[in-house]
Amino acid sequence: MHDIELIKKDPELFDRAMISRGFGEQAEKIIELDLKKRGELSTLYSLREQRNAVTREVALLKRSGIECTPQIEASKKLAEEIATLEHSIKEDTKLSNLLESLPNVPDPIVPVGKDESHNVEVRSHGQRRDFAFGIRPHYELGEMLNLLDFKRAAVLSGARFSILKGQLAELERALASFMLDMHTKEFGYTEISHPVLVNERTMYNVGQLPKFHDDSFRTTNNFRLAPTSEVALANLVSGTTLPRDSLPMRFTAYSQCFRAEAGSAGLDTRGMMRQHQFGKVELVSITTSDASNAELERMTSIAEEVLKRLELPYRVMLLCSGDMGFSASISYDLEVWMPAQDKYREISSCSNCRDFQARRMGAKYFFFENKKKHSTLVHTLNGSALAIGRTIAAIMENYQNEDGSITIPDVLRKYTGASAIMRAEDALP
């Protein structure tokens, strides 16, 4: 959500920001609707004062035994006008609807661009492997090994679902444990286990609603299946005012995520790159306004560290204004090398939302200055570290062997108890 006072202070700056995000000029309309609303509220306050004055006059006249029928009629008329105006103000949601539909303002360093072709590479890490044999895509390897079953998943659920078996299911569990251990034991994150069914207010608070109404799954009793742990983790501080010395708060969670993938027809129709349900380890930070820049760099470096320890080649991309998420002010994408596709693919996105989500959530922190208490909105950040399905796909493709087996990265072997993934003989019917 946006601060109207900042929009009014520099409408040209706000318009440039919205244009860069593909939304066109918006400031004039916002200011016009705000003036209308303020005018109506001013009129409402005036009418209430008039009614109160007439009510006092009626009481005085009655005590004095003086006829007051005209004043009583005037009071009734004012009450009707007040009720009509109150209803009109309550029903007029044009301003709030407009503000809710607009994305966050990009940071000054964010490159202006329409789509991912305008993203900027910041750095890369790792050496791409030279294969002496034909590279197989992860979905082909998984089916060869009898460990990845898309056909049976389609029978159970439909398209864009998968079943992992045996060593591949163990690898999934190993990755989640490895990532959570690293985040909690080395980097000070608090692990959270949270509901995956959330109410619509919780989704609204982080910017998932109303803009992306069709992108999440909705139950018949108006719950939503959370598309990311960010939804729950950020909302842990909704409606609170925290002491400054309690920040930063850092949360991590492994959860199943659910996405409708609206508008993705024809994209990544095979494999584990784009699914309706997938596991992900998420990082969320709640911090102060002066510390959020450094917190984003820290969070991004932690996500990178996961890839470094897995020895997967990757690059870091600074997203352009047109490719960022709705609530983000600045985002880095980590893209892992997928040899079978001969290109980098997103495996993590780390974003600073500044006070955009906090304004919706009513999340603040307080501090004392010159013995006076002050409060201001927190800054929220989120990052995936990492998406488990895509990490499995990357390991399968980068660590594949000519015989179809897959070498397990060294860092995971204490979790798997094995050094390689071999073919499973226990086929499902």
UniProtKB/Swiss-Prot annotation:
GO terms for biological process: selenocysteine biosynthetic process; seryl-tRNA aminoacylation. It catalyses: tRNA(Ser) + L-serine + ATP = L-seryl-tRNA(Ser) + AMP + diphosphate + H(+); tRNA(Sec) + L-serine + ATP = L-seryl-tRNA(Sec) + AMP + diphosphate + H(+). Pathway: Aminoacyl-tRNA biosynthesis; selenocysteinyl-tRNA(Sec) biosynthesis; L-seryl-tRNA(Sec) from L-serine and tRNA(Sec): step 1/1. Its EC number is 6.1.1.11. L-serine binds at T228, S229, E230, E282, S384. PROSITE patterns: AA_TRNA_LIGASE_II. The keyword ATP-binding applies. Homodimer. The tRNA molecule binds across the dimer. Belongs to the class-II aminoacyl-tRNA synthetase family. Type-1 seryl-tRNA synthetase subfamily. This is Serine--tRNA ligase. It comes from Anaplasma marginale (strain St. Maries). The lineage of its organism: Bacteria, Pseudomonadati, Pseudomonadota, Alphaproteobacteria, Rickettsiales. The gene is serS.
